[in-house]
Amino acid sequence: IGALLISSGLFTACDTDFENPNNPTEDVVLGTKEGLFALATGIRQYYSVTALRQVIEAPGITTRELGVTNTFLNINELAKGGAELPGESGGITNPWVNLLRAKGMAESLIEGANTVELSPGTRSGVIAYGNLFKAMSLGALIEMFEQAPINNFADGAAEFSDRATVLANCISLLEEARDMMSSSPVSDEFKSTVLWPEMNLQKTVNAFLSRYYLLAGNYTESITAANAVLNDSDATNSMWVYDANNQNPIWNRTVNSADLNPQTNFGLLGAYVPEAGDGRVNFYLGDDAGFANGDAGGQALSEMLGFFGTNTASIPIYLKGEMLLNKAEAFARQSQLSDAVIQLNLVRQKNDDPLSVNANLPAWTGNETSQADILEEIYKNRCIELFLTGMRFEDSKRFHPNFVVPTAANTTNERNRNYYPYPTVERENNPNTPADPSI
């Protein structure tokens, strides 16, 4: 698998490939069923250990979920944000490079599935799996960057697309995955060789469809996809699983290395501070853990628990609570306020979550006729329920689009950037790199 991961470098947007005579050639990897299965397994390992860290860490620092406890320049630059976050910062280069690599591996898998002779059920499994990983990688990129390349180019000169186009492509990939699995159910061969017991591919595709439909403003479709997850007869919770050799990447950055720690109260201030008795606080956060660096804000920190407390703790690929909150927001934005409050209260009153993310609070007592108030309560619950899922950066921009982010460094606002500048390594190697966003 390691060789496959190394060889995948030739599929990134900027050309960083180095010849290694011990690596299988691209033709060997993509030309056999066994090679495709090995690549699929390699994608899972790379994404869950390497790319997922970047999906969670950079947005988590930008939106005050995580506090910085060392003097490493890259994460301190993220904590300050504003104009002090330069294109050469590793804090934004790492997400860019890692997600492009994961996306390139998925593109190679999809290409191979269309050329290698496979049974219909195996082909649908390989393509659905590849489409899912490409959509996840693209979605994470467009939540951090104003534009992103939909397809990697071998010469490094990938073309960029705007947010709406990228989201539409994510949706198209996932719709194709959903429809292929419906017309040609995934084969037992693919399930037993590539998938793992904690993975329901169909539910996961629908969960990400619900997410990206919501971001694109396709509210009815988001509700339908969320219902497909919530009403699925299979109780499997799709999880990234870890062992001693492939360790939980957020545990590794918090508990193990203490470079970062969760901010107390999830970094929320004022009206967004969790209510007394909210069970999600004690699920995710432990005892007081000191303070962040003064230059990074000096915020109060807590011990890491939840899905990141041990080196082998599994991380959910999506949460049931996200599906409920997606429905709540979609109803609210369509002015179906009573339906929105019903879904919101399902989250607030939840005490039987399959992964123990239980607020166990009473029903909301706010103004049920105010769309603005309902949306604010949904935002607050997304910040708590979906802690360290990589979603808060996107959520902050969607719920508070008129918030003016200062150009000066800031460690107290709910976000200190709207989008990241494009990494210098991309700009120096790709003439198609757009101008940086203003903030």
What are these regions (language model features)?
Residues 14-15, 171-184, 202-241:
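Aromatic-residue-lined binding/catalytic grooves and analogous aromatic/hydrophobic interfacial grooves
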Residues 14-62, 226, 355, 401-439:
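Membrane-proximal, proline-rich intrinsically disordered regions
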Residues 37, 73-145, 155, 159-164, ...:
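Conserved, well-structured interaction surfaces
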Residues 75-79, 217-324, 351-364, 371, ...:
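Hydrophobic-face positions in mid-chain alpha helices that act as interaction patches
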